[in-house]
């Protein structure tokens, strides 16, 4: 009898193991047989493969896209080509997790790419989402595939993500007997613009959109990116500032503006209050540069922080927010034309691969704005259809963003209120915007940028600390986020968290009230 009592736990454990193996085998078998079950218009399945967690995938990609990706959890990986016109197709992947939560999610892209965001596919599938991602209708990060190829360009503007969602939802229903309960979109930068395109042109296609650092006002953005080269000139010109010079400018901006939020912590909480005066850095007579700037360089700084206006003084794009100079200088003020802008005018605006980007003028911006193919501006300020659909949109923008000015997101917010005739509180019912102090472009930065918008910023999956899960709670429980809590890492994700800070819902801003020091999250208040 005693022997039997000892055997029972063993038998129970063995049965559990056998059951787990059986479930896993069923999932793997379902995956390996899945390709033969897919019969959708315009969809050609390349393969459906079971990928166990911890696998390091080698990706068949062009050199400018990801070459490998560690898969965090067991998935069924489905790769396919989807025809979008007689002259275009997208490469689409769906990652179906074994530990499925009944949620569907589409990822976005970045830059002018061209590249499936495999890290986002892994991040969302690890969290239990059936996840899709596409290559935006072309391969690589260059704009050259747009050259005399309007169908490829149309895929880039909107059709790739929309098609991926339509096909992805069908596949999810086919793969899982229970289908899906809720649907989401997650993207940043170009991915942010794609999220806004969904909101503007396909309201209700997903239940929740997380759209970070959005490249909306897209042609204005590329014009703004292009206009820095005429301001700074090439390396070595009188108007050019070295990286050391920009470090000097950054320290002076902090001296003038850091304390305006109540704490000197190297982070500017509200750039709207900061209007840098670079004349304080002007070299005295006889002084050598290195710890000061020439009058010509001072003028360069002031021009960099001015908005971009058309030839008739109409706003094209707002100013670069001050406070992120150490990130912006190597990317935007490096003495070379900005690559994405150069590609846009060469392969889209003028269809002339020999066009000289160093000759860019405001007239080129105006020509591009008149063109605006497929309304890539993504600047429609009436989101009434999105509101009426019941869908939610959460957007965020880093206040040290070096590639897309956070002022553009604020400009759009105010355009929404004016166009729709609503108050901030009314907008909050379906649209919330969070300024993330100390965050550069979509990730990294000097402050509490760990908000879970991607794997590279994740420290928690609690809704208070993770924008994706905050959206899930908003959609599924009706609890909208009041703040987004970010983590300041000592040395990137996975390192020690130095402090936390709650980022405010716009138009509120963070103010240090004390009594603790600036690392105490309770010492800050949204006002």
Curated annotation (Swiss-Prot):
Major subcellular site: secreted
Active site: 189 (acyl-ester intermediate), 401 (charge relay system), 441 (charge relay system)
GO molecular function: carboxylic ester hydrolase activity; feruloyl esterase activity; metal ion binding
Top enzyme class: hydrolase
InterPro entries tied to this protein: AB_hydrolase_fold, Tannase/feruloyl_esterase
Signal peptide: 1-19
Reaction it catalyzes: feruloyl-polysaccharide + H2O = ferulate + polysaccharide
Described purpose of this protein according to its UniProt entry: Involved in degradation of plant cell walls. Hydrolyzes the feruloyl-arabinose ester bond in arabinoxylans as well as the feruloyl-galactose and feruloyl-arabinose ester bonds in pectin.
UniProt family annotation: Belongs to the tannase family.
Protein name: Probable feruloyl esterase B
């Amino acid at each position: 009898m005693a022997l039997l009592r000892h055997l029972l736990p063993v038998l129970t454990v063995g049965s559990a193991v056998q059951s787990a193996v059986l479930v896993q085998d069923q999932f793997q078998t379902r995956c390996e047989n899945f390709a033969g079950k897919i019969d959708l218009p315009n969809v050609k399945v390349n393969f459906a493969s079971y990928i166990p967690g911890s696998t390091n995938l080698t990706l068949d990609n062009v050199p400018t896209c990801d070459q490998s990706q560690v898969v965090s959890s067991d998935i069924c990986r489905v790769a396919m080509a989807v025809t979008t016109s007689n002259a275009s197709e997208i490469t689409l992947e769906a990652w179906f997790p074994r530990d499925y939560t009944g949620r569907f999610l589409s990822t976005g892209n970045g830059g002018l790419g061209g590249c499936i965001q495999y890290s986002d596919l892994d991040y969302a599938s690890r969290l239990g989402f059936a996840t899709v991602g596409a290559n935006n209708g072309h391969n690589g990060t260059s704009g050259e595939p747009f050259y005399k190829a309007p169908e490829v360009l149309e895929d880039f503007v909107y059709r790739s993500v929309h098609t991926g969602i339509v096909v992805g939802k069908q596949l999810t229903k086919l793969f899982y007997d229970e289908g899906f309960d809720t649907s989401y979109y997650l993207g940043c930068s170009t991915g942010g613009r794609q999220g806004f395109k969904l909101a503007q042109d396909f309201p209700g296609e997903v239940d929740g959109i997380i759209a970070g650092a959005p490249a909306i006002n897209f042609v204005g953005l590329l014009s703004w990116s292009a206009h820095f080269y005429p301001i700074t000139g090439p390396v070595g010109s009188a108007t050019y500032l070295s990286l050391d010079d920009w470090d000097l400018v950054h320290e002076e901006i902090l001296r003038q503006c850091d304390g305006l939020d109540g704490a000197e912590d190297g982070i500017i909480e509200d750039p709207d209050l900061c209007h840098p005066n670079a004349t304080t850095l002007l070299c005295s007579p006889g002084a050598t540069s290195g710890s000061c700037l020439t009058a010509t360089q001072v003028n360069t700084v002031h021009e960099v922080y001015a908005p971009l206006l058309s030839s008739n003084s109409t706003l094209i794009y707002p100013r670069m927010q001050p406070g992120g100079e150490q990130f912006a200088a190597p990317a935007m003020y490096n003495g070379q034309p900005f690559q994405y802008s150069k590609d846009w005018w060469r392969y889209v605006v003028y269809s002339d691969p020999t066009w000289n980007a160093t000759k860019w003028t405001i007239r080129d911006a105006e020509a591009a704005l008149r063109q605006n193919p497929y309304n890539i501006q993504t600047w429609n300020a009436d989101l009434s259809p999105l509101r009426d659909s019941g869908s939610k949109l959460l957007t965020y923008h880093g206040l040290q963003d070096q590639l897309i000015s956070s002022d553009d997101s604020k400009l759009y917010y105010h355009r929404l209120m004016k166009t729709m005739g609503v108050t901030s509180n009314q907008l909050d019912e379906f649209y919330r915007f969070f300024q993330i102090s100390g965050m550069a472009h979509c990730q990294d930065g000097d402050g509490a940028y760990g908000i879970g918008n991607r794997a590279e910023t994740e420290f928690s999956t609690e809704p208070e600390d993770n924008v994706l899960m905050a959206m899930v709670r908003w959609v599924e429980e009706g609890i909208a986020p009041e703040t987004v809590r970010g983590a300041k890492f000592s040395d990137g994700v996975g390192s020690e968290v130095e402090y936390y800070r709650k980022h405010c819902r716009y138009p509120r801003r963070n103010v240090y009230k004390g009594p603790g020091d600036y690392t105490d999250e309770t010492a800050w208040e949204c006002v």
